[in-house]
Design a protein with these regions (language model features):
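Acidic, metal/ion-coordinating pockets
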Residues: 26-396
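N-terminal Lys/Arg-rich, disordered targeting/topogenic segments
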Residues: 1-26
Length: 396
């Protein structure tokens, strides 16, 4: 046997032994490759489904905003020749609360409203119900509310006299000194109870009432007083906004009392009704008054600021209204929509910057584009909030 043949057989033997030794390794590599390929495919599928989910949520919010007020906004076509200086832009938020956690861990308070300042300040009038006081650090909270763009607040609520009439008077004076107008503190005459806001040649009357809880100091809803106030408003303004503190807490259902009071207000000249107190969102609608003009009712916009551990209470609406003023000074409801927002609590482990109000539509869009401005947990809360809005606004 030649030396070359012997060497060849030796190499074949070594090669077979190499294959045998590495057989398990090869199988492992193949398995790993299969896992990697499957993972990539699964991730791609999840990403596609996630993108579809985000798109659906964006579309659903847009659908809510466009479907609700078709009857009111249909009149836009007849006003195509309007000029921007003939429109008064009004925004409204719900109850402005400053609970213990928000007071202690929400500082600096300005950071809560970062996403909303431009939206709220780009209006002629921004309304809300100021359901807290200005003691201790709450005075800084009041300043941040003003900085956020809110310039007109109702003091007619069930907690107005929790700390006595002196505290109510101090709150009223402090807010006025900040540059925020107030309404709802009890006065003897309609002339003093009804506040008039003037803009672009129009006068807008602002009225505010709360339900009777056995305390005085603010305007308690009473048909005789309300009728007199609206009569004064109709004689001295072009348009009337009534802020109501009513309804059942934590209920998205409209009570019979709310329906009855809303009908009474519209029949006596109210053009817009803005509701608060339930701490959750309730439905909204556009109805015709006796003259066939559109009137808006927002039964509850929810809590603008709160620290309740309740997802439904963290959901809130910013109402956006446009009032058209013609050359003769007549004012009519021109357009209505809303911005859904959500109050986020970033966790009990934080001692500051714990709370923030998010623009739901913007955050859902950002999440879909890969901008990690919110966590998956917060995103899922926003999705659940969209579901809640859908059940309240579309299906009722």
């Amino acid at each position: 046997m030649s030396r070359r043949s012997s060497r060849g057989r030796g190499r074949n033997k070594e090669f077979k032994e190499f294959l045998k030794k590495n057989k398990k390794m090869n199988i492992t590599i193949i398995v790993l490759l299969v896992i990697i390929i499957c993972s990539i495919a699964t991730y791609s599928l999840i990403k596609i489904n996630q993108d579809r989910k985000v798109a659906i949520e964006k579309d659903r919010i847009s659908m809510q905003q466009s479907d609700i007020f078709k009857s009111a906004n249909a009149e836009l076509e007849s006003l195509d020749d309007y000029k921007s200086n003939s429109l008064i832009r009004i925004s409204a938020v719900g109850d402005i609360l400053c609970g213990n956690n928000l007071e202690k861990y929400g500082m600096p308070y300005d950071s809560i409203f970062t996403e909303l300042k431009k939206k709220l300040k780009n209006t002629d009038l921004t309304l809300g119900t100021y359901e807290t006081d200005v003691q201790d650090s709450k005075s800084d909270f009041a300043t941040s509310i003003k900085n956020a763009g809110i310039n007109y607040v109702s003091l007619a609520h069930n907690h107005a006299l929790d700390y006595g009439e002196e505290d109510l008077n101090e709150t009223n004076e402090y807010l006025n000194n900040l540059g925020m107008k107030t309404v709802g503190k009890y006065e003897e005459s309609s002339e003093k109870r009804v506040k008039i806001f003037e803009k672009k040649g129009a006068k807008i009357a602002i009225l505010a009432y709360t339900y009777d809880n056995g305390k005085q100091g603010v305007n308690i809803y009473d048909e005789e007083m309300v009728r007199a106030d609206l009569e004064y408003a109709n004689q001295n303004s072009n348009f009337s906004i009534v802020m109501m503190h009513w309804g059942d807490v934590y209920s998205s259902e409209i009570s019979e009392e709310q329906k009855s009071q809303a009908e009474f207000l519209i029949d006596n000249g109210a053009d817009i009704i803005i509701g608060a107190h339930p701490s959750v969102v309730q439905k909204m609608e556009v109805v015709k008054n006796k003259d066939g003009q559109d009137c808006y009712i927002g039964y509850s916009l929810g809590d603008f600021t709160s620290d309740f551990e309740n997802e439904d209470s963290n959901l809130e609406l910013i109402l956006n209204l446009q009032v058209y003023v013609d050359t003769e000074g007549k004012a009519t409801l021109y357009k209505v929509d809303y911005t859904p927002v959500y109050m986020v609590d970033y966790g009990k482990e934080l001692t500051d910057n714990r709370f923030k109000i998010l623009d739901m539509k913007a955050e859902i869009a950002n999440y879909g584009e890969g901008q990690n401005s919110v966590t998956e947990d917060i995103y899922n809360k926003l999705v659940r909030a969209v579901d809640k809005l859908n059940s309240i606004i579309i299906k009722q």
